[in-house]
Amino acid sequence: MADLLRLEHVSKTFSPGTVHEKKAVEDLSLALAKGDFVTVIGSNGAGKSTLFGAIAGSFFPDGGKILLDGEDITFLPEHRRSRQIGRLFQDPLKGTAPHMTIQENLALAYLRAAGRRSPLGIVGQKERVFFRERLAALGLGLEDRMENPVGLLSGGQRQALTLLMATLVTPKLLLLDEHTAA
């Protein structure tokens, strides 16, 4: 079976050449097949979030190569990777736009993952019904609050919404960075 994700000698150093230099990831190689479920364990500051950031494209590694489904994505911008990679952040505030409504956040996630561009206000009835059904499945009553700003949600509600946003269109890879932190 071909690798879904392959990292080859990936390294990332922050503030290189300064007194604050920090090697967050050093010469890491791994291969994951489709369907693999992997847990990365390490103490605070061990580089787990840095690893996820490099895979998701939040920043580029200093060295090495990242391949997703055989495609070299090492220097592919984050917005292009987000069509294939779903992500939940350690901080639930990072996964949503708090001043936008639940529906607007879902629309952004849906359009991004589907690779479509559309003015934000243009969400058809079909999409609204789809969003409502998916929200109802969470059992949190958010389907009745689709016009409410996300900033009014609790941390747990926002994290559940972020998970839904990351999986509205099934990603090839789902990264969960301390997703229960909320």
Task: Give the label of every model feature segment.
Residues T167-K172:
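A short, proline-enriched helix->beta-strand linker immediately N-terminal to the Walker B motif
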Residues T18, F60, D72-G86, K94, ...:
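ABC ATPase NBD coupling module
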Residues G64-D72:
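Conserved ABC transporter NBD signature motif
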Residues H99-G115:
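Q-loop/switch helix immediately C-terminal to the Walker
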Residues V38, S49-S58, M165:
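Short, conserved post-Walker A segment of ABC-type ATPase nucleotide-binding domains
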Residues I41-S43:
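The feature captures the beta-strand-to-loop junction immediately N-terminal to the Walker
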Residues A2-L4, T13-D27, S58, F75-P77:
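A short, flexible loop at the N-terminus of ABC-type nucleotide-binding domains that lies
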Residues E178-H179:
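Walker B catalytic motif
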